Amino acid sequence: MPHDIVMGLDLGQATDPSALAILRESPVSGADGRIARDHRGELLFRYDCLHLERFPLGTEYPAIIGRVEELVRSPKLQRSRLVIDATGAGRPVVDLFFNSRMPAEITPLTITAGSEVREDRWNRTGNRAYWVPKIELVSTVQSLLQTRRLRVVPRLALADMLKRELLDFKIKVTASANETFGSGREGAHDDLVLAVAMAAWLAEHQICQPMIAASRRFPTPASRDRPTQPVRRAIRPMWIRSGFWR
């Protein structure tokens, strides 16, 4: 099967559900019929969100692993890339995914509050793993939406839920220049947004960065030109005019 499927799994905690997103990657064709490139010469791909799934609160991790394994063992999803939230309690769960030996290329991703992307190897497995600032994930989604390269199939049962999460998602920059992210409504969640963002980030990052053997750090745009005064901005207008809904 073509290696064009990327799955993102956001692992929830006691008050947050876990969520799974499946994206299909396809090249953007230029006027000459070749794969289009951006201003830096990087190849351009678009991503169609084919599947969204939210697990009920309280779903045990072995049940989530079983469901994901069921999906990746289906003929159309074998050899998919699977990026898993390894933040906090997610670390031992990632090890359980590796132990399952499901037919997927598993990549752990730890969400951080810093300003650099770090790449290293995961424990004894030797698999590539990333530590990624949350603003980097958000910026990736913003860029893809603004260039109309991220779309969702509107018939998906959770398509409207994802849209609400996108509309509610806000960025707050504090006086100390630290970003905080999340829903602007009490009791709302951002699990679907993060599942999509992790999958999209991994796909975009692997296009631009080859496999490397040693730990490496990549500066992010978030580390530059930070405001010195508190700023709160909703990013909802960008979602509305982006052409996100096919």
PLM ranges: what are they?
Residues 139, 143, 194-204:
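Short, hydrophobic/amphipathic alpha-helical patches that form generic packing surfaces
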Residues 14-28, 195-198:
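Acidic, metal-ligating active-site segments
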Residues 174-187:
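Short, solvent-exposed helix-loop connector elements
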Residues 1-18, 29, 38:
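A contiguous, basic/glycine-rich beta-loop/short-helix subdomain that forms a polymer-engagement track
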Residues 29-175, 225-246:
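Mg2+-dependent endonuclease catalytic cores in nucleic-acid-processing enzymes, primarily RNase H-like
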Residues 6-10, 19-22, 83, 194:
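Structured core elements
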Residues 131-132, 184-192:
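Structural motif
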Residues 190, 200-246:
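Acidic two-metal-ion nuclease catalytic site recognized across multiple nuclease folds
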